[in-house]
Amino acid sequence: MDKKQLLRNLPKIDELLKEEIVNRYLQENSRTLVVDSLRQSIDYYRGEILKNNIDSFTKENVVNYFIDTLEENKSTKFKKVINATGVVIHTNLGRSLLAKEAIENVVKVSENYSNLEYDLKEGKRGSRYSHVEELIKKVTGAEAAMVVNNNAAAVMLALNTLCEEREAIVSRGQLVEIGGSFRVPDVMKFSRAHLVEVGTTNRTHLYDYENNINENTGVLLKVHTSNFKIMGFTEEVSSEEMVQLGGKYKLPVMEDIGSGTLVDFSKYGFTYEPTVQSSLEKGVDVVTFSGDKMLGGPQAGIIVGKKKYIDKMKKNQLTRALRIDKMTLAALEGTLKCYIDEKEAIENIPTLNMILSSKDIHKKRAQRLKRRLQNNVKDFNFKVSEDLSMVGGGSMPGERIPTYVVKVNSDKITAEKIEEKLRLSKNPIIVRVSKDEVILDVRTLFERDFNIIVEEFKKLLK
């Protein structure tokens, strides 16, 4: 059949609305949703005809496509996915998972009115920052604290407050890109601080900073390169040295430690990453860090440091534009409460638990998952192997965590096709593919995920 005839044969919406099955959906759903889904179905077939992808179709084909489209339109676009990649803080999959206490706190303040900006004791308007400031001070040792909506905003607000139309001196090797093409120099530009690069990519000395200090210098800035590492012939100025230099010239020292951990991971066998507490103990005036990376909480930019600087930031007009919402505050409060006891934090905050849980635990879990798959899924090969997980989220660059995985292959379907089908399934499962094998890393899986994985594997060859 020629293209023109195929286009003429496309059914009209009014015609499809008379179909019994479409009428059933019309009784259960709004007319707008049904008509939009019918239009999408007709448009799909029109496009396929114009691209010469089909040479025939039936009204039944159009109706079946309508049913799938309607169900897709009814479903939410923001979906739960199962992370089998072994990347704990997966940037594209929502970064950190919240602790149970944080989730309960969010639900409580979301389904009820709350004292977001109301001082119950005084009976008058209060500050939204008061709900978490004392907690942040307690777990970090800071004089003062505040929170904005992400760490880039925290850096921008701090620089704008300390350094508007003045110079911020920073090492050339610390001008990082933090993902999505957002770069420290660009954030500085929007803060209206003037960037002064010193040193070289791999080596910066104290005299590089000192030689560039003048009457227009506003801040000495240190940026932790949390998402990459320079090895070999390197030199950088320590926080202590910068604090001494700042004191000599009466300049504030600011440090952005990015992923922002409150736990010293070197105690657990990892490479040392600067903690928020250590930066403050060294005398750094202002420290900024993320809430949804190593902290294991919601997306937030946390600013801690000297009270005189934090108070100025709270009064900055930018603060209202960057302020945090009630649900994030509730999640952050619930997360921070766990940190009152480090052992409790490691046990209850999923990010910390996943990173620090032992390889032996995951060996047993991988064996359980393999048994369930073998007992319920035919035509696939399953084996347990040692492998390496990643922290992710631009944290601990180069660090790999020994783990156990389930490797999968089949003579009847390629690894790439398995990956695609799992990703597009009703319960999306995100996996790794390597050397013609699908890899399921149990470090980032929950026990509740195992049954879902088995059920989705059962459907792969249907």
From Swiss-Prot:
Entry's localization field: Cytoplasm
Entry's Gene Ontology BP terms: conversion of seryl-tRNAsec to selenocys-tRNAsec; selenocysteine incorporation
Keyword Metal-binding included in the entry's annotation: no
Keyword match Glycosyltransferase: no
Domain of life: Bacteria
CC annotations in GO: cytoplasm
Pathway: Aminoacyl-tRNA biosynthesis; selenocysteinyl-tRNA(Sec) biosynthesis; selenocysteinyl-tRNA(Sec) from L-seryl-tRNA(Sec) (bacterial route): step 1/1
Record's keyword terms, sorted: Cytoplasm, Protein biosynthesis, Pyridoxal phosphate, Selenium, Transferase
Cofactor: pyridoxal 5'-phosphate
Catalysed reactions, as listed in the record: L-seryl-tRNA(Sec) + selenophosphate + H(+) = L-selenocysteinyl-tRNA(Sec) + phosphate
Matches recorded under InterPro entries: PyrdxlP-dep_Trfase (IPR015424), PyrdxlP-dep_Trfase_major (IPR015421), SelA-like (IPR018319), SelA_trans (IPR004534), SelA_trans_N_dom (IPR025862)
Main localization, broad class: cytoplasm
Record EC number: 2.9.1.1
GO molecular-function term, one example from the UniProt record: L-seryl-tRNA(Sec) selenium transferase activity
N6-(pyridoxal phosphate)lysine, modified sites: K293
Family the UniProt entry places it in: Belongs to the SelA family.
Purpose of the protein: Converts seryl-tRNA(Sec) to selenocysteinyl-tRNA(Sec) required for selenoprotein biosynthesis.
Name used for this protein in its record: L-seryl-tRNA(Sec) selenium transferase
Gene name per UniProt: selA
